Regions:
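Extracytoplasmic beta-strand-rich oligomerization domains located immediately C-terminal to a leader/signal peptide
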Residues: 40-200
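Extreme N-terminus of proteins, especially the signal/transit-peptide cleavage junction
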Residues: 2-3, 267
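Exposed loop/turn and edge beta-strand positions of beta-sandwich/beta-sheet ligand-binding modules
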Residues: 12, 76, 247
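Aliphatic-rich helix starts adjacent to a transmembrane/signal segment
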Residues: 3-62
């Protein structure tokens, strides 16, 4: 009679138990690696978001002039409102209440700069005899013209109409600004974010904020927000009406970003800040 080699029931149970232990260990290792990767990805994404926000703030606030660009009563811990430069040029031709932005002649030093096309509600500034004068823009059109100026023959087509009947001579330096506001706001889910808003004339006012970075911490020692300093480096008191904008020489924004990574029962906080020194050229 032939006998067949096989496994006893005890051996089968031992083999199954060992296989389960190996598979369980491998599963735990894979899950741990996935969680670690997710935590690292969340932290890196938060760092990238904060870094991008700081770059944007630095570039935009770095173009401000302390004398007129900051809005009185709007330099606060939670918000900063200012006139953001959107275009600069030389006047080509003007009539009462209208002027045209001159294009740069070929081979000349660039004088025309447009970060954003002017629109109704922006403010046009022109250099008068001893100071800058401002007027609200009521219309923007394309109207090709040529003109003579102290700089020679010029041409342009971007024309702005003002709410006041001033006449602006050819060759006059121009600057266009737009009311802009950065503010820390609370979203519908209860989280805090830094938001960006630009003034709109239709309807008049600031639209809903566009999130720049978040979610932010707004309590305790890790409080995200703006701080303001004078020429000596002393921090300015904000009181109930904000910092005195005539004394602001430097602006600091600090972001404490909350990152829900759930690492050993704890979340992560990523912190970054930027200091912007304002220009002190003759206004606006």
């Amino acid at each position: 009679m032939l006998s067949r080699a096989g496994l006893t029931l005890v051996e089968v149970l031992v083999a199954l138990t060992l296989a389960a232990l190996v598979l369980g260990t491998a599963t735990v290792s894979v899950l741990g690696q996935q969680r670690a990767h997710a935590r690292l990805r969340a932290v890196l994404d938060a760092d990238a978001q904060i870094s991008a926000a700081m770059t944007v703030l630095g570039e935009q606030l770095g173009m401000l002039n302390v004398r007129q660009d900051l809005m009185s009563g709007e330099a606060r811990d939670s918000a900063l409102q200012f006139r953001a430069p959107v275009a600069s040029a030389i006047a080509c031709a003007g009539w009462a209440g209208r002027t045209t932005l001159a294009a740069d002649p070929a081979g000349s030093v660039p004088l025309l700069g447009v970060a954003s096309l002017p629109r109704t509600g922006d403010t046009l500034w022109w250099l008068g005899d001893s100071a800058w004068v401002g007027g609200a823009i009521t219309a923007v059109t394309n109207n090709p013209v040529t003109c003579a100026s102290p700089l020679g023959a010029m041409s342009g087509e971007l024309q702005v109409t003002l709410a006041r009947p001033d006449s602006i001579a050819s060759g006059t330096p121009l600057r266009i600004t737009r009311q802009t506001r950065y503010g820390v706001y609370r979203a519908s889910d209860g989280t805090w974010h830094l938001g960006f808003r630009e003034w709109s004339s239709k309807p008049p006012g600031f639209p809903s904020p566009q999130p720049v970075v978040g979610s932010l911490i707004r309590t305790g020692s890790r409080r995200s927000g703006f701080r303001y300093f004078d020429d000596t480096g002393a921090e300015l008191d904000q009181g109930t009406s904000g910092a005195d904008v005539t004394r602001v020489a430097r602006i600091r924004f600090t972001a404490h970003a909350f990152v829900p990574v759930h690492d050993r029962g704890r979340d992560s906080v990523r912190t970054d800040s930027i200091d912007i020194v304002l220009q002190h050229a003759r206004g606006p």
